[in-house]
């Protein structure tokens, strides 16, 4: 066995390091809450490091993918199929959440009087003007300036500019070769930076978890444990049953895929942010044989439109509040709730605290269910956000592979090789694997 493929000692595995860091963070937050709460800057710092690199990585990936394509019609086809998939799956997630919360009824028997709830804590989420309309949302996709889009890290704005830049570079043909080569080399530097940042992922996961447990405590988990259990169960059903069926129909196993991205899942568990692994997910999906142009379009768009975990949360939280406050909801009202959420969940994409903003706007629009009931779930929202982020991450990964297969841009041999031999993949950093693949392609091209 070559040195490159030699398996690393277990203590050097990022998976083991993050798992240990999360465990230590939980213990510190539980036994020393005050000290645990002070660890917040460690988690925030790691997420900021990742966000620093997301916009340029999306730009390079999308531009290289589009400018290197022979058929420009494929870009529009890929985008259209991705949006169709997102709409179907997010609607399915809303429906499943609605069914499970009606069957398990986690809020039944609580008999909460809405007038007795402290609404000051939710004022920031229910203030007028927080919720975007459809027109405002679409206009917000267009940046005021390119610099502004990159400076603020607005994913959809960066994606729009990247697509236009890729189209323009493609039209230049041979005259744009120098620019194309520069962007391609620049992307390798960016992914190397990601590799450096990921070395401190355990520190970020430790800080974020210590803060969460230190501030909110394990007690808040038990006080609303029935809702927590129902929500986590629903997310598991969605990932391993719904996405499992979708994966099987497209020739791969969701169980193997989850194992393949286990390091990313652990980092998301620790940080409660699926954005913290966006660059690394893009690399790993390319390593599985998905074309760069598909990965570059589907993943960033999915982070705004394909939030399966958030969709499950929205219907379950809304009906839970109705059950807890003894507010009857007829079938017609629940169907109306579903229809409104199909629209409002898209309008709040990318907004901080979007779960509460969407819920507040939706409950107000549907009527009947007291908005004050949001105060009930505020205390456990942080813990539920972890399940949301994990489900969103797996959902976007599966979506990318499915859309790539639909458009004929998925190398099934590489997919099965990557999923069936995880030990080989784990023995190397994704950046190393990607660089090796680029080198092989360059050699093949020179011989061709």
From Swiss-Prot:
Disulfide bonds: none annotated. Keywords: Cell inner membrane, Cell membrane, Membrane, Symport, Transmembrane, Transmembrane helix, Transport. PROSITE patterns: NA_DICARBOXYL_SYMP_1 (PS00713), NA_DICARBOXYL_SYMP_2 (PS00714). The chain crosses the membrane at residues 13-33, 49-69, 81-101, 149-169, 193-213, 227-247, 294-314, 335-355, 357-377. Gene3D superfamilies: Sodium:dicarboxylate symporter (1.10.3860.10). GO terms for biological process: L-aspartate transmembrane transport. It is found in: Cell inner membrane. Its main location: membrane. InterPro entries: C4_dicarb_transport, Na-dicarboxylate_symporter, Na-dicarboxylate_symporter_CS, Na:dicarbo_symporter_sf. GO terms for cellular component: plasma membrane. It holds the Pfam family SDF. Responsible for the transport of dicarboxylates such as succinate, fumarate, and malate from the periplasm across the membrane. This is C4-dicarboxylate transport protein 2. It comes from Polaromonas naphthalenivorans (strain CJ2).
């Amino acid at each position: 066995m070559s040195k490159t493929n030699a398996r690393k000692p277990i203590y050097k595995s990022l998976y083991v390091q993050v798992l240990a860091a999360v465990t230590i963070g939980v213990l510190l937050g539980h036994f020393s809450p005050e000290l645990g709460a002070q660890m917040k800057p460690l988690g925030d710092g790691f997420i900021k490091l990742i966000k620093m690199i997301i916009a340029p990585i999306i730009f390079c990936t999308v531009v290289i993918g589009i400018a290197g394509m022979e058929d420009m019609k494929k870009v529009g086809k890929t985008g259209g199929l991705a949006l169709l998939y997102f709409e179907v799956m997010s609607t399915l997630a809303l429906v499943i959440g609605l069914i499970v919360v009606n069957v398990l009824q986690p809020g039944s028997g609580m008999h909460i009087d809405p007038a007795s709830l402290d609404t000051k804590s939710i004022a920031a989420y229910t203030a007028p003007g927080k919720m975007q309309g459809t027109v405002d949302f679409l206009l917000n996709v267009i940046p005021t300036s390119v610099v502004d889009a990159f400076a603020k890290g607005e994913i959809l704005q960066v994606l729009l500019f990247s697509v236009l830049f890729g189209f323009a570079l493609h039209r230049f043909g041979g005259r744009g070769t120098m620019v194309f080569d520069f962007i391609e080399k620049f992307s390798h530097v960016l992914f190397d930076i990601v590799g450096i940042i990921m070395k401190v992922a355990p520190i970020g996961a430790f800080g974020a978890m210590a803060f969460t447990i230190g501030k909110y405590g394990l007690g808040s988990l038990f006080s609303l444990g029935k809702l927590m259990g129902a929500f986590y169960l629903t997310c598991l059903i969605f990932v391993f049953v719904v996405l499992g069926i979708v994966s099987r129909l497209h020739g791969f196993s969701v169980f193997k895929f989850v194992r393949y991205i286990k390091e990313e899942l652990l980092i998301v568990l620790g940080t409660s942010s699926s954005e913290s692994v966006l660059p690394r997910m893009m690399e790993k999906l390319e390593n599985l044989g998905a074309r760069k142009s598909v990965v570059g379009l589907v993943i960033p768009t999915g982070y705004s439109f394909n939030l399966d975990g958030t969709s499950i949360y929205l219907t379950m939280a809304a009906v839970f509040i109705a059950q807890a406050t003894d507010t009857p909801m007829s079938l017609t009202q629940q169907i109306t709730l579903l229809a409104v959420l199909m629209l409002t969940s898209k309008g709040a994409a990318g907004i901080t605290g979007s779960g509460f903003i969407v819920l507040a706007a939706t409950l107000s629009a549907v009527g009947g269910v007291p908005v004050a009931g949001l105060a009930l779930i505020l205390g456990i929202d942080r813990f539920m956000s972890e399940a949301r982020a994990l489900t969103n991450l797996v959902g976007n990964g599966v979506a990318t592979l499915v859309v790539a297969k639909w458009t004929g841009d998925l190398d099934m041999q590489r997919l099965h090789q990557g999923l069936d031999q995880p030990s080989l993949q784990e023995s190397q950093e994704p950046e190393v694997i990607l660089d090796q693949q680029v080198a092989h392609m360059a050699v093949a091209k020179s011989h061709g």
